[in-house]
Amino acid sequence: MSKLKTLNRQFISNLETHKVTTDAKRNLILSILKSTTTKREAKNYLTKYQNQFDFNDDLDFNKSIKIKNEQSSLTNRDSQRELFINRFLNQSNPFINVYDKEDVKLQKVPLRLAIFKIKFTKITIKQWKGIAETFKRLITLGISPIIMLDYDHLPSDSYKNNELYMINQGNKMLNYLGHPEEESDLKVTLLRSLFTSHKGVPTLDSLESILIPLYQGIIPIIQPIVYNADLSKQEFLASDKLLLGLSSALIEKRTTDLLSIEKIVMIDPIGGIPSIERHQTSHVFINLSQEYSDILSELFIGHIEPKYRDTHVDNLNTMNNVLSYINEKSGNDETTGIITTPEIMSINIDQLNPIIYNVLTDRAIISSSLPSTTNRTPHLSTTIIKKGVEVQIFDVDNYDKDLTMQNLFDDKLVNKEKLIDLLNDSFGKSLDVGPYLDRINKNIATVVIVGDYDGAAIITWEYSKGEKIAYLDKFAIAKKNQGLPGLADVIFKIILQSHPFELIWRSRKNNPVNKWYFERCCGCMSAPDSQWKIFYTGEVFDKKIDRFKRKLRHQNGVVDIDRKLQQYSEICEGITPSFK
């Protein structure tokens, strides 16, 4: 009887555990679906991070232990940890193929890393509590964080005093975030002297010193201390060199199947890179391949205090160096840079915390192509950065011949076949090539090509009542890239920057993209008997609109809206469809 009672209690206990586990999994999935705004984003996130979780019902009593173990063996992060750690303790290579002696070989589950460089100034206890919760949430979402401490603000003439300060701050961090020996949700360990410097170049001595804690679910905190082999002494290492050294060690030591660097995060009290266009609040998104040099120049004319300007320049340069290096070595643009403040990182709402939101969606909280002059566009202190894609822009300012489509084809600046293939793919229809090129050939205003024809835009000059108006004729993104974070924003920002005064475009009334267009225009209109919705924007609408046809309408600073709408309607309704 006692044995039966024991089995009964165990069965009830297993049911309760099963319920808790099932509820936790359900809540995780619901929170992911709630925080992602589209099905594509939710699918992309779950595809990338699915092996970081065990969504299998491993408490199914109808399965034998053997079957359960075979199904779960080494197919998710938790089930690989013990194997790797035991190998390391036995002084063997922890990361050789996990099925060396088996016929079936499974791909290793990579660690999804986020490297945090935290500037240790002006962070309140309340903010630390919020930051700790953010780290817990990131771990729940499948991210393995690494923390680097930034003490660049300290004077470099006294190692002893700085070391005492760093030890004190490190102990505070352990108290804020949790000790590895404690039974808490968050465990951290403090590491120092992981690097050796030779001729000014830091190298990581032991990659396992970082990876083993990560596989144990512990966040490693790295102190910026390096052993100088040339001078045989310990010294401090600048945070930018430490970040690049750590990133290169993780990428270079043949660990691409073991880990991926998903995020490079800088936590700095001054926040993201300031933008003149956004009235010194932060750039929302930076495509380094296209914008790096322009933004660097902008920082020196943006009326920023020199000490803050220099910090922003350092942050931008460091991000550019690290992301460029990772991009070159990995061959992809998966790594995202984030610069934000401690206050913002401490926010514990997925949709408002830009780090958590970026893990879920791989984009910024708001779109970078939203007009900064409208009240509905919030101002942020966070910048999202990608190495990004190369951009080619052709207009009268950078082309010394007559700007015609045929000339661009003849000079091999635009690949005709690739452009037509892109348009066909993007719109899902066949372009009526001959008539279309004949119509736009001599009316080209701007042509934008992104990447290897990953996206493109064609702007033409159209005429009405003796005036020429910029018309967005084609805005195309390859189907494989539709939904790719930032690509549409990159192209649309270039379009608006190329024609800031006045721009119009049309879209079919049933086009699901119309909501996206509406958020980026000054206004739109459509006739009841027309299939088109017409959008317009530009600085011309910063002027006063005269709706009552007063005599003032011909004065400078006033736009005759009736005349404008008639022009727009005449142009957009008069252009024949370009697809068969």
From Swiss-Prot:
GO molecular function: L-glutamate N-acetyltransferase activity
InterPro entries from the UniProt entry: GlcNAc_Synth_fun, Vertebrate-like_GNAT_dom
Enzyme class: transferase
Superkingdom: Eukaryota
Signal peptide: none
Keyword Amino-acid biosynthesis in record: yes
Subcellular localization(s) per the UniProt record: Mitochondrion
Entry keyword set: Acyltransferase, Amino-acid biosynthesis, Mitochondrion, Transferase, Transit peptide
Reactions performed catalytically: L-glutamate + acetyl-CoA = N-acetyl-L-glutamate + CoA + H(+)
Pathway(s) it belongs to: Amino-acid biosynthesis; L-arginine biosynthesis; N(2)-acetyl-L-ornithine from L-glutamate: step 1/4
A GO CC term assigned to this protein in UniProt: mitochondrial matrix
N-acetyltransferase domain sequence ranges: 403-560
GO biological process assignments: L-arginine biosynthetic process; ornithine biosynthetic process
Main localization, broad class: mitochondrion
Induction of its expression: Up-regulated in cells treated with farnesol and grown at high cell density in N-acetyl-D-glucosamine medium. Expression is regulated by the general amino acid control response transcription factor GCN4.
EC identifiers of the protein: 2.3.1.1
Similarity comment: family membership: Belongs to the acetyltransferase family.
Primary role: N-acetylglutamate synthase involved in arginine biosynthesis.
Protein name, entry field: Amino-acid acetyltransferase, mitochondrial
Organism: Candida albicans (strain SC5314 / ATCC MYA-2876)
Recorded name of the encoding gene: ARG2
